[in-house]
């Protein structure tokens, strides 16, 4: 079978364009914000429910599209999203509503994970010319500093009640990983070194300190309130949307990507070796040698505990493979980059309507025709393409 040139600027830009066309302009709700639930054919199947993660990720998508194409409609869509984020998601307490339905707030819990994407959205808003977003970044950072930052551990706690009075005992690496990503973006937008310094601290404390608590020196997902590994959290719910049990190969490779992105901004001699280690081990343990693709999760003993194939795992991994190839010139990573794309091209990408299927089973079959429920937006796939594009010469 012949494939496109997956490592070419022309291909990556065309793929982003087709993915954007799946969502835009259908996703624009003239009443405010974005529709967030799409069937395989692009039709909206829930016009009312809005999730903070989708509301912010769409802003990223449109801002990045504008920055790379200079198409004004994309900037207008990003601004449309910012207005909804500030008018509807932002609460009087200073936090952001996690889930809402029209005029009803369904879940007002304050999540660090959600606030990470608020910072990412504001950073992108600043990059497309909304100068007031620099203050919004600062205010959100200060909010996190006041309520979420645990100086003793050098990490962010995970969730707090809407009135800021009840702190969940759960601690997780996922929110800290996305805070690292968001703070790098904040640094890029503002050039304020405190954001990069914090991103570097998060990377060190998760990828070195917390990873050292696991026997394999990989990043476990779940922790107790004193940041000790909780091996049993969601053990009976391995498919939990945001907190699945097991090592997440997609998060090992996503950290590999982030470490290499940090290395570009402020080099440290441990970034590349750790990125290689996390990526190599995850790829070895999670790659389906019979049917292709990376599985979703594996147990501490290395056996696969969730054989499904998720879109974002393949996308984050091809970005990491490419950055590793660029950093090491090792052809193994180039081949893995192509292999991940070939699997995705054959099974995960909808060549009829555009965008990626969210999830496949271990036999590479779809579970349903809900391509893009809340939280997806193809932020991972397009974001991965943009990271590769940044390294390609014009």
Swiss-Prot record:
EC number, as in UniProt: 5.3.1.7
This protein's UniProt keywords: Isomerase
SUPFAM superfamilies assigned to the protein according to its UniProt record, in alphabetical order: Six-hairpin glycosidases
Taxonomic superkingdom: Bacteria
GO molecular function: isomerase activity
A Pfam cross-reference name: GlcNAc_2-epim
GO biological process, one term: carbohydrate metabolic process
Keyword Isomerase: yes
Catalyzed reactions: D-mannose = D-fructose; D-lyxose = D-xylulose
Positions of the catalytic residues: 251, 380
pH and activity: Optimum pH is 7.3 with D-mannose as substrate.
Temperature notes for this entry: Optimum temperature is 30 degrees Celsius with D-mannose as substrate.
General function of this protein: Catalyzes the reversible isomerization of D-mannose to D-fructose. Can also isomerize D-lyxose, with lower efficiency. In longer reaction with a higher concentration of enzyme, it can isomerize 4-OH D-mannose derivatives (D-talose and 4-O-monosaccharyl-D-mannose). Cannot use D-glucose.
Family per record: Belongs to the N-acylglucosamine 2-epimerase family.
Complex and partners: Monomer.
Swiss-Prot/TrEMBL domain comment: The alpha7-alpha8 and alpha11-alpha12 loops of the catalytic domain may participate in the formation of an open substrate-binding site to provide sufficient space to bind 4-OH D-mannose derivatives.
Protein name per its UniProtKB record: D-mannose isomerase
The organism of origin for this protein: Marinomonas mediterranea (strain ATCC 700492 / JCM 21426 / NBRC 103028 / MMB-1)
Lineage, top ranks: Bacteria, Pseudomonadati, Pseudomonadota, Gammaproteobacteria, Oceanospirillales
